[in-house]
Amino acid sequence: MWWGYSAPLDLRCEIEEKEETSKSLEVLIIGASDARHIIKTLASSYKHSDCSIIYHIIEPTMEQVARSILLLSTCLDKDLGLQEATRYYLEIMGNTLLRPATAKYLAKHSKLLADTVTQTIDCPWLNLEKLKHKDRDQLEWIFKFWERATREGVPIVDYWDRRIRKSLKTRYDYRDGVFDWDYHMILKPRGHSNLTIHEYRFWRNNGIAFTWIEGEPARSNPTLLNNIIPLGDGFLHYAYLGDITNGPFFTWALNEEKENVKLRATDIAEREVMRVIHEIRTKEPFCEELVAAHRDPSILNGIIITEMPSSEIEYESWTKYNKYEKQSVPWISIPSTKILFHPLSTLDLLKNKAEYKEKFDTIWIAHNMTKQLPNIIPLLKKKGHILIELRKYLSELRKEDLESFTKELKSTAQVCGLREIKSFNSETHTIAQFCSN
């Protein structure tokens, strides 16, 4: 729900260069959750010819829209150091608890983003005009809730533990054995070579995926909560409803290259996020030495955090930050990029609108949105590419489930008039590629 299960893609590589599409491109992304494809494509722009791109984004919930905006904004924040921005991004994306510095940034930045929704502060790359007024109101509530919940604390680790107890039932007391089984018998054979058992087990127990020697996570991450509704002077929200079996290790931490150096999934993710932020800022290739200095091989066989912080720290209230200065707009300039969010309800409507017929050069679809294929195909240009996320890294699915998904997807694609670019199956691939006839 809060992250994807496939590596970030440079979407320019998926578009066949043609004269009529070389200066302006339209891309539709459905259900990606974490803006990784936009970030990767932005970072790789210096490798391609100059081109303006409009990204049209559809997410199932407004909380996912808000997280996408926050994660994009963090990567584009020119006031942050390179490693600082990288770790803020990874912690906010995948940890139930944040380091104090990250939590302070989240509280301050949430206030800034709430002001961008109301257009008190201008955000040049963000376009919310397609959202309904109630959606924009909800988006503003979410950012305000994050700012307040980060200061006041929410019991997210307790929410996490309740989910684990409900899921495992009588096996809860033997949960480490369950986690080890899922790791060794399911995830490891599927090919994630850098995810260590210590990282995976610690995340399954507590929801903390990415850890470093410098600083311990102690403040709750409210961006992982959903169904946020204002009530009087406060807010109502659901407890944690996201993924508790797979983890945020299958996007930036996926490493397809064979390396002699053994690294944790955290190290790979940090390197790849640092790479894209560096390339967005400098439009130059990334130097590996920028990230290698702090690594210690001894951490491979252990975890950096040995015990969870006291819940009193998680709930400790902070004072409210002063209003963000209006003239302080922190984003890097990306003049050739616009990011346009649409409400989920438009998926059923766009195919009937003339201006969207054969509009998009490339469409990317999450694994849980494939039922929408019949609504999406009319939006794709002739010879355009459609990319569909597969379910390789969903540990709750067995071999027969993956085979069934592959078979059903191929059948649906054929009925919709799509042609496979490369043969695929869900056991060995993370993306299926199709082309319109």
List PLM regions with ranges.
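Domain-level detector for long C-terminal conserved domains
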Residues: 1-437
